[in-house]
Each structure stands twice: as structure tokens, then as C-alpha cells.
Amino acid sequence: MSLDKQIPIIYDFGENYEKNKDIWRRQCIYQILTDRFALDDHCTTAPSTGRMYLGGTWRGIIQKLDYIQSLGCTAVWISPIVKNIEGVTGYGEAYHGYWAEDLTQLNPHFGTKQDLTELVDQLHKRNMLCMIDIVVNHMAHAGDSPIDYSKYAPFNSPSHYHPKRFLHNYDDTWDCEIAWLGDEVVSLMDIRTEDQEVHNFFQNWIRDLIQTYHFDGLRIDTAKHVQKEFYPPFIAAANVFAFGEVYHGDPKFIAKYLEYIPSAANYPLYYQIENTFFPPKQSMNIFYQKAILEARATSMDTTILGNFTENHDVPRFLNRSTDYSLLCNTLTLLLFTDGIPIIFQGQEQMYAGGHDPENRDALWTSNYNQQNPIFQFLKKLIKLRQFLVDNVSGFTTELSNMLFVNEHVYVFRRPGVIIVVSNAGSNSDVDTSAEFSITERESLEFIDVLSGSQFSSLPTEDSSTISMNLEFSFPRVLVHRGLFHSMNELA
């Protein structure tokens, strides 16, 4: 039997695996870089850019939970919590949390054990979840001087690491798993995660971390740089939902990892959104083929992938296109396509930074403005999404159904809602009309949640038809009149 025809092994991800998937499908996640989200003293004029620690803390997050909850997000993903290397490197300080030195201690820049415990407790009191970012692939060393292994905990010997050799071929899986990331400025020392001693530590460590702080989920950094077999017992020990950063645009590549990790960041979707909207370089037809159909042709369950259009590793949308219509279309797609939507801090405030560190500017300079038009736009979409999650059977588990697609318009349906998006842009004079059929035979009234416009379906022999044109190529989010009124009554 050839390797590609073998039946995959079904791994045990813990006794609550199915329950955890169902819980996280229902969420809208807000991603936070702790150092860049909120200060203890509520200051909004402190320094906000660069590669140094700027002062954001866990207590600062606690003080701004009303802001996140007002937006509508139901879960918070916080950056790594462990002690990092200190001092200024050629790439600045370890404010982001991904340069670990001691896995047994918290990062003192972010606060105390009491602060972190209170943050999770306060989220739970609001019926919100907390996801923690973790790194199991590497520790960090600054400069090209000899490494003092004794300062690292618990991996304090050269025998805990693969031999020093920097990664050059990111498409070679074996090389990705044993070579070091980084360079001589900051080298990321690749941990021998295949060793049983390392396995044992990490399984005990993550079990203790979850039991101590009651985190609800894990985001695993640099997931493709660790042997896949490491993950199932590790995730079973955590017994919470986990998704990995598998930085690759091919859904077939991602699918291989989903035999070992419950979920992954949906980079294939991100790259297709980028090509279709940032600004448009391909048609909506091609988007549908590559982003939707090619993903479904794999073994992936796309309903549990983590979807995003911005994060701490890629330039902001508005850095590449200032078209407001395109921005709104990408956010509509993000909230309603199959999967779990993730909003990166600052996205709701129309931040426009480019590559690291410009895409990581502190949020306090926005003054946490809840009247920002994109904050209000997202709030409306998230409110509808959560209503559908809570009240419409199958919304989180049934795959979307394409109703219409052409060069500039894509229409799809999920239980309770019809989504119409376009990549034509606000200044385009191309045709953005759409006519599509739905299975209901009778005439139905739909309301666009974004504009308040009303649309009626016209009965045909075995279905009914809806016709519309997108003004300024702005998206439409259609719900049945009865559902619309029910949502407003519950507000």
C-alpha cells in the first residue's frame, strides 16, 4: 500500500475533544498582544510603536474587557505568558513573548500569577473564553556569542536541542522540524521534541498550566516546525481545544497536520482573500475554487479552522488597500465563511501598519473608540453571527452553499443567512448585479442587516429567485424578516 493511500491513524485528543470543538465553533476570537493592548494606568498617550516593551499588562486587559465585550467577541487569545530573554537585541526586546528562556516562570513584564488568574476569572464571569499562545518548538538566544545553556529552564543542556543549523528550505518538512529558526541576531534553538524526556515535561507542563489558570484553549506557535507525532498526547494532556500555526497556503499541506492537531490557522483562506481583495488580483470565481472547493477536497473540517484577515505576522489590510468597500467585504467574509473568525487587535480601529513591528502598534492611541465606523460595522456583524450561533440549528456545523459566483460577486448561504460579497471596489463601474435561486418556493421577505434594504424572492416552478445590485460594491447580509425581528427583540 502506498503511503498516500494508507488509512490515517485516529488519535485521541482528550476526553472532551468533541465537546471542545463544538464550544469553539461558536466563538468569535479577539487576538491580543499583551504588551500592546492596554496599560495599567489607562494612559492613551504613551509610546505605541517599535520593538521594545511598551507596558501592556494582563491587568490592563482586565480593565478593557468591557471594550472587547462591547465589540461582541466571545473569546480572547493572549500572547505567550512565559519568561522571555531580557535585554535589547538587534531585533529589539521580547515584548511579543515568542523568545522563551524559562518555561517555568511567568513574564514579569505582563504581571503576576494573581493578575493572570484574575484575567481568566473575569473572562469566565462574562461567559467568555481564554486561549493562550504557547511555543513548544524553541527557546531563544540573542547574538552570536556562545550559548549559556544553564540559564534555560527546563532545557538547560545542549542535548535538549538539535545541532545549530539555520533553516533555509521552508518546504522541506524534515528540515523544518530539526533546523533552527531565526539567525545570528536572535537564534531560536530548536528543541528535541521527539525525545521522551521532552515529551514528558511538556505533557506535565501543559496539564499543570491548564489546571492552574483554567485556560480554555491553546494556540500553538510554529506548529509545522515540530514533529507531528508530538501533538496528540500533548493535546490530550491539555484536554482543551487547540489550533496550530501551520504557515502554509496549500490546504493539502494543512490537512496533513489536522490528523495530529484539532485545528489550524486558515492560511490557505488568508492567501486567497489577500489575492482577491488586497487589492484584487484574481476573480471571485477563482476565489471560490481555491479557497472553498480545494479546501473541501481535502480531509479538513473547515468549520473548526481559525479564519483571519490580519494578525501579528502579516501587514494590515489598510496598508495595502484603502478601499473601504473592499475592507467591509473582507470582514463580512471573515465573519460568515465556514470556520471560527479571529479579529486582531486594532483591526476594529482601522489600523494600517505594514510588516512587523508596524502591524503591532499599541491600541491605546485609538482611545478605544467604539464609534469608529469599522468597530460599529464589526459589532453589527458579530451580533448577527452570535444570534445565528445561538438560535439557528446547524449554523456552526453545516458548510456554506454557493448560490452565485462570477468575476466580481460571490453569494453563499449558511443556515439563517445569505451573504453577498464583491471585490469590485467602491470606485469601480463594473457590473455587480446578482440573481440567484433559493430552495424555498414561496415568496419570502429578506432584510439586509447592513443597510436595512428589503428584498423579496420571486417564486418559480421549483424555487424562488432574488435579484439585486451592490451599491458601491458594498456587501449585503440577508436574513429572513421574521428572524431579523426576532434578533432585534432579543437585543
Swiss-Prot record:
Q: Does the keyword Disulfide bond apply?
A: no
| CDD domains the UniProt entry points to | AmyAc_euk_AmyA
Enzyme Commission numbers on file: 3.2.1.-
Q: Where does Ca(2+) 2 bind?
A: 221, 245
Where do the annotations place Ca(2+) 1 binding? 137, 177, 190, 225
Quote the catalytic residue positions. Answer: 221, 245
Which domain of life, per UniProt?
Eukaryota
- Membrane-spanning ranges: none
The GO biological-process annotations, alphabetized, read as: carbohydrate catabolic process
Q: Name one Pfam family in it.
A: Alpha-amylase
Q: Where in the cell is it found?
A: Cytoplasm; Nucleus
Q: Belongs to which family? A: Belongs to the glycosyl hydrolase 13 family.
Q: Which PANTHER family match?
A: ALPHA-AMYLASE, ALPHA-AMYLASE FAMILY MEMBER
Question: What's the protein called, per UniProt?
Answer: Uncharacterized glycosyl hydrolase C27E2.01
Record the organism: Schizosaccharomyces pombe (strain 972 / ATCC 24843)
Q: What is the lineage of its organism?
A: Eukaryota, Fungi, Dikarya, Ascomycota, Taphrinomycotina
